[in-house]
A protein has these predicted regions:
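Alpha-helical cap/lid subdomain in secreted, periplasmic
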Residues: 91-237
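Sec-dependent signal peptide recognition
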Residues: 2-8
Length: 237
């Protein structure tokens, strides 16, 4: 009986270790086991990739690019919806049930709909600061693993040019919201990427705009990735 219990214990240990290995990746170059990284993307239509294929959206292109550069990343978890403002993103995160302290990378891009609806900049600042703290909580309190992206200028798109709104006014308002999110991001000690100038290239390059004439194309998102990926690599490697 005692001998049988020893054998059973050994089998259980081996089974557990086998299960653990399934959730890891073996790096043959260093002969070590590497845990894949978990990535959470928070935002609005610019995060889900409205009007482009899922593999073309910003989170998936970023994950693929980082994988090519040596990181191993699980498929991104995206909490975002077209039209969301800061307050709606906060509610969406709460309703999503996504657990805190489980992510190695968090990106945040939010605010265009606050600007589009003419909402208060003071309210935006308050809610954006709250979202920054939520993002920090998701990364096990590792501030260097939070990456904030500036709001692109939708006024530079064909839809923006034909919307009946003055594109110059749109640009000034977008810049004002970006001043706020940059100030709060840097004050919190987080990473900030300014992709807004690249978004304005859509004025002369329509391949940067999706078929709906408003949202970024996969090519535009690739440009954002080129801006953000080096920051992620520097902070995670």
């Amino acid at each position: 009986m005692r001998y049988s219990m020893v054998i059973l214990s050994l089998l259980l240990i081996l089974a557990c270790k086998k299960g653990e290995v399934k959730s890891m990746v073996n790096d043959s170059t260093t002969n070590t086991v590497v845990n894949p990284l978990n990535y959470l993307a928070l935002g609005d239509s610019y995060t889900i990739g409205e009007s482009v294929e899922r593999y073309e959206n910003f989170p998936n292109q970023l994950a693929n690019d980082l994988t090519k550069k040596g990181l191993i990343i699980n498929s991104p978890i995206i909490v975002a919806r077209t039209g969301w403002t800061t307050s709606e993103l906060k509610s969406g995160i709460k309703d999503s049930g996504v657990p805190e302290h489980k992510f190695d990378i968090v990106t945040l891009l939010i605010g265009v709909n606050n600007q589009y609806r003419g909402e208060s900049k003071d309210v935006y600042r308050k809610e954006f600061k709250e979202l920054l703290q939520i993002a920090i909580n998701f990364t096990k309190d590792k501030k260097s693993h939070v990456f904030v992206i500036s709001i692109p200028d939708w006024g530079a798109t064909p839809h923006g040019q034909q919307s009946g709104r003055d594109p110059q006014v749109i640009a000034k308002e977008i810049d004002a919201f970006n001043v706020i999110n940059k100030e709060e991001t840097l004050a919190a000690g987080l990473n900030y990427s300014n992709i807004t100038p690249f978004s304005r290239l859509a004025l002369s390059d329509k391949t940067l705009v999706a078929g709906d004439g408003l949202h970024p194309s996969g090519k535009m998102y690739a440009g954002w990735v080129a801006n953000v990926a080096p920051l992620v690599l520097t902070n995670l490697k």
